[in-house]
C-alpha cells in the first residue's frame, strides 16, 4: 500500500495556521483543469512527513484562488475575455493561477507491514514544501472504513453529488448523481451500539428510520452478546418505542418493516393493541402494551405518571408512600369503580384522617387517570418483555395510539423497570443483568428542558446506563432541544440534513468534530439519505460523509397480499409459554373463580378473537394457584405449625409455586406470605403472628412466622 503516487500528488505544504480548538494546515495547489470535475470540499488529503510511509491526514475545509490571475490585473483581464467571448487560455491559468487550501488535520497515517494504521495524533510538523496528495483508491477505502472486518455496511462514501458506488447495483441512480470510482462502502461495527449512546439527527423524511432499521437488521443477523463474569456470553435485547408504527409491519405504501427481514423472523417480538393485517404479521405479536401496575412500585408509577408540578402535593406524597398491599387494593378498587370508588376505603388505604376529604378526592382523581391510562389486570406484558429481552430479541412497542403523555409514561415505566433490575443485579455473586439497547424516537420530548414527567428514567438510562450494559439510540429532529451534557456523551453520531441554526450549533457545541465546513454541508445539501457519521469507538474518530443504503431496496414485504399463514416466530413461542403457565395455574384454582379470558390471548387471527365478557385477573390467578399449592404442602405446613419458620423460609416455599416465567418472583412471594398465611390459618394475630428472634449470624433480628392454632381452612 502506497500513500503517494505520481498521479495523486497535487501540491505542497505551506505551514500550520491558527484554528482555535482545531489543527489546520495551509496548502498550495497548482491549477489543474480536472479540479472542476472532482469533489474538492470535504475531500481527504495526505501531507508527507519523514518519508512516503507516513503522512498527516486531513480534510479540505476551504479553498481560495491566488496568483497573478487572481490579482486586480488578472480580474480585469478575465472580465475583458468574458466580454469579448473568448476563453482564458489554459497555459495562462497553469502559469498564473494557484489555490490556497485550508486543511483540517485529522491525525496521522502510517504504513506498517503493508497495512494502514491511523493515530489521532497531531504532534508532527511536515517541512515547508512537503508534498500533498489526494488519497489513492486503496488508501481512500481504508480511511473511509471500507475494509473493516466483521462489520456492517451502512452506505456509500459520498461528497455531495459525488457517490463512490461504481458498479454496485444496490444504488438507485438519480439524474443528479455523479458516480465515482472506486466503490467505497464505509462499515460500522454494529456491536458498538451495545452499552453506548448513539445519536441520530435529521429532519423528517431524510432517512432516520431507514438507518435505524438497517442498523438493527444487520446487528441481529447473529444475536449480539456481551461477556459477563466468568466468560459467560449473554445475549443483548433491544426495545424500540415506535410512535408511528413504522418499524414492525409494512406501512400503507408497502415499505417493509423489521418483520420482513427473513433473518429476524425468530428475533422480532411486537407488542401492539392493533390487529395484524394478516395471519403472517399477527404471528409476530406477543400481546398488548398495557401494564399491570399493581406489580410496580407506587413511587415509580406516581413519579413518572404525574407531572412535576404535582409531585409535592400532599395526596401525591401519600400515594408514593403506600405499601405494596395497600397499593394493590387501591388499584383494584379504582379499576373497578373509578372516581366512584368508596371514599372511606380510599382514606383507609392512604392512612388519611376523616377531615382530609380534599386529599382523598385529589388522590382518587389522580389514580383514576393513571389506572385508565395504563392498567390492565390481565396483562403479562412486562414479564413477556423481560423474558424476550433476556433471550436477545428485538421488542417493538407500538405506542402510535398513545400519543403524548401516556406514551412517555408507559415507556418511562418500562425503562425504569429494566434499569432498576440491572442495578439490583449488578453486584450480586451470580448477576442476571439484561443487556438492552433502547431506541427512542422524538428524544427531545424526554431529554429536553421541558420538565416532562417521563424524563427521569430516560436521563438515568442515558447518563448511568452504560455500566449496566444499557445502550440507547436517541433519534430527534431537534438536537438543540436536548441537554448539551447528554449530547456530549454520545459515542456514535449520525447527522443528516438539519435546517435550524440552533440545532446545527448544538451539534457543534456537543461534538466539535462537526466543524463549520461539515455543518454547512448538512444545511446546504438537503439530500435525503446523505449524512455524516462519526464514532469514538472504532479507532477512526473523524467524520465520514455517507449516503445510507436503502432498507427498502434490500428487503420487500414478505406478505404483500396479506394472505400468508402464520409463521413460526419468537412471539408465538413466547405466547405459548406464558399461556401454558397461566393455564397450569388456572387448573389449580377452585372452579368458582372468574371466567377465563385466556383464549383471547392465544388467538393468532384478528378475525377469530372470541368475545370475552370479563377480563382475567392474571396476578390473582397466579397468587391463588400458589396458595393452593402451598396449602397442599403438608410436610412444610406441619413444620410451620409445630416450630414456626422464618419469613424468608415461607417466602422461598411460596416462590417454588410461582411460575418461572414471571420476572419478579421474589417480590411476589414476599407480598404473598401474609395473604397465604391468612388464607390457611386465619387473620394475623388470631391464627398466626410474626415475631423477631435473634439471628444466628448475630446481625439484625430475623422475622419468624408462627401459627397460633391449627389450620382453620
Model-derived regions: residue spans:
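Glycine-rich phosphate-binding loop of nucleotide-binding enzymes
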Residues: 171-272, 484, 533
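Substrate-engagement module of ASCE P-loop NTPases
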Residues: 219-223, 418-423, 457-473
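P-loop NTPase motor domains
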Residues: 228-233, 245-255, 275-460, 535
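Conserved ASCE P-loop ATPase motor domains encompassing nucleic-acid-directed helicases/translocases
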Residues: 1-155
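Conserved ATP-driven motor cores of ASCE-family P-loop NTPases powering translocation/secretion/packaging/pilus
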Residues: 462-543, 668
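Conserved P-loop NTPase motor module
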Residues: 528-713
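N-terminal pre-Walker A segment at the start of P-loop NTPase domains
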Residues: 146-186
Amino acid at each position: 500500500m502506497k500513500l503517494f503516487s505520481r498521479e495523486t500528488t497535487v501540491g505542497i505544504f505551506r505551514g500550520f495556521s491558527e484554528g482555535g480548538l482545531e489543527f489546520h494546515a495551509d496548502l498550495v495547489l497548482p491549477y489543474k483543469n480536472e479540479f472542476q470535475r472532482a469533489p474538492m470540499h470535504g475531500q481527504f488529503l495526505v501531507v508527507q512527513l519523514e518519508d512516503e510511509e507516513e503522512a498527516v491526514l486531513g480534510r479540505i475545509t476551504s479553498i481560495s484562488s491566488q496568483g497573478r490571475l487572481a490579482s486586480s490585473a488578472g480580474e480585469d483581464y478575465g472580465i475583458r475575455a468574458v466580454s469579448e467571448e473568448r476563453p482564458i487560455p489554459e497555459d495562462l491559468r497553469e502559469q498564473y493561477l494557484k489555490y490556497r487550501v485550508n486543511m483540517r488535520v485529522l491525525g496521522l497515517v502510517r504504513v506498517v507491514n503493508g497495512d494502514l494504521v491511523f493515530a489521532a495524533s497531531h504532534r508532527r510538523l511536515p517541512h515547508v514544501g512537503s508534498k500533498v496528495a489526494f488519497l489513492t483508491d486503496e488508501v481512500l477505502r481504508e480511511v473511509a472504513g471500507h475494509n473493516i472486518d466483521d462489520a456492517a455496511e451502512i452506505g456509500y462514501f459520498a461528497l455531495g453529488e459525488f457517490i463512490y458506488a461504481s458498479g454496485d447495483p444496490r444504488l438507485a441512480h438519480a439524474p443528479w448523481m455523479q458516480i465515482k470510482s472506486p466503490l467505497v462502502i464505509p462499515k460500522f461495527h454494529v456491536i458498538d451500539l451495545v452499552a453506548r449512546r448513539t445519536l441520530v439527527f435529521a429532519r423528517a423524511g431524510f432517512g432516520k428510520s431507514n438507518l435505524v432499521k438497517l442498523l438493527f437488521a444487520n446487528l441481529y443477523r447473529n444475536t449480539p452478546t456481551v461477556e459477563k463474569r466468568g466468560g459467560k456470553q449473554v445475549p443483548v435485547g433491544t426495545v424500540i418505542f415506535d410512535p408511528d408504527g413504522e418499524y414492525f409491519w409494512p406501512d400503507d405504501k408497502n415499505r417493509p418493516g423489521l418483520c420482513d427481514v427473513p433473518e429476524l423472523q425468530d428475533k422480532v417480538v411486537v407488542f401492539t393493541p392493533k390487529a395484524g393485517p394478516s395471519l403472517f404479521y399477527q404471528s409476530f405479536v406477543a400481546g398488548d402494551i398495557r401494564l399491570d401496575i399493581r406489580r410496580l412500585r407506587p413511587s415509580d408509577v406516581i413519579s413518572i405518571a404525574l407531572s412535576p408540578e404535582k409531585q409535592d402535593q400532599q395526596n401525591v406524597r401519600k400515594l408514593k408512600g403506600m405499601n405494596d398491599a395497600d397499593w394493590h387494593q387501591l388499584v383494584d378498587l379504582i379499576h373497578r369503580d373509578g372516581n366512584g370508588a368508596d371514599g372511606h376505603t380510599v382514606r383507609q388505604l392512604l392512612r388519611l384522617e376523616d377531615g382530609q376529604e380534599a386529599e382523598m378526592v385529589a388522590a382518587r382523581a389522580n389514580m383514576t387517570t393513571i389506572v385508565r391510562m395504563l392498567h390492565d389486570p390481565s396483562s403479562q406484558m412486562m414479564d413477556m418483555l423481560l423474558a424476550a429481552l433476556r433471550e436477545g430479541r428485538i421488542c417493538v412497542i407500538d405506542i402510535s395510539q398513545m400519543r403524548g403523555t401516556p406514551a412517555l409514561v408507559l415507556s418511562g415505566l418500562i425503562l425504569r423497570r429494566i434499569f432498576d433490575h440491572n442495578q439490583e443485579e449488578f453486584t450480586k455473586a451470580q448477576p442476571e443483568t439484561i443487556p438492552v439497547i433502547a431506541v427512542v424516537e422524538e428524544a427531545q420530548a424526554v431529554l429536553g428542558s421541558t420538565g416532562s414527567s417521563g424524563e427521569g428514567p430516560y436521563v438515568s438510562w442515558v447518563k448511568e446506563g452504560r455500566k449496566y450494559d444499557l445502550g440507547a439510540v436517541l433519534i430527534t429532529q431537534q438536537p438543540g432541544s436536548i441537554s448539551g451534557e447528554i449530547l456530549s456523551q454520545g459515542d456514535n453520531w449520525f447527522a443528516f440534513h438539519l435546517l435550524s441554526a440552533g440545532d446545527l450549533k448544538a451539534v457543534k457545541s456537543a461534538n466539535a468534530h462537526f466543524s463549520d465546513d461539515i455543518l454547512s454541508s448538512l444545511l446546504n445539501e438537503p439530500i435525503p439519505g446523505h449524512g455524516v457519521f462519526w464514532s469514538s469507538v472504532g479507532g477512526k474518530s473523524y467524520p465520514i460523509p455517507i449516503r445510507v443504503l436503502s432498507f427498502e431496496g434490500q428487503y420487500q414485504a414478505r406478505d404483500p397480499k396479506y394472505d400468508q399463514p402464520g409463521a413460526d416466530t419468537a412471539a408465538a413461542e413466547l405466547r405459548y409459554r406464558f399461556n401454558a403457565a397461566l393455564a397450569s395455574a388456572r387448573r389449580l384454582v377452585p372452579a368458582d373463580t372468574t371466567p377465563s379470558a385466556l383464549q383471547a390471548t392465544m388467538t393468532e387471527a384478528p378475525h377469530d378473537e372470541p368475545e370475552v365478557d370479563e377480563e382475567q385477573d392474571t396476578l390473582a390467578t397466579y397468587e391463588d394457584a400458589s396458595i393452593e399449592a402451598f396449602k397442599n404442602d403438608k410436610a412444610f405446613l406441619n413444620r410451620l405449625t409445630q416450630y414456626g419458620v422464618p419469613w424468608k423460609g415461607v417466602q422461598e416455599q411460596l416462590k417454588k409455586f410461582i411460575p418461572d416465567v414471571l420476572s419478579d418472583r421474589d417480590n411476589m412471594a414476599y407480598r404473598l406470605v401474609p395473604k397465604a398465611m391468612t388464607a390457611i390459618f386465619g387473620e394475623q394475630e388470631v391464627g398466626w403472628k410474626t415475631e423477631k428472634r435473634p439471628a444466628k449470624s448475630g446481625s439484625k433480628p430475623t422475622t419468624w412466622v408462627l401459627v397460633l392454632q391449627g389450620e382453620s381452612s
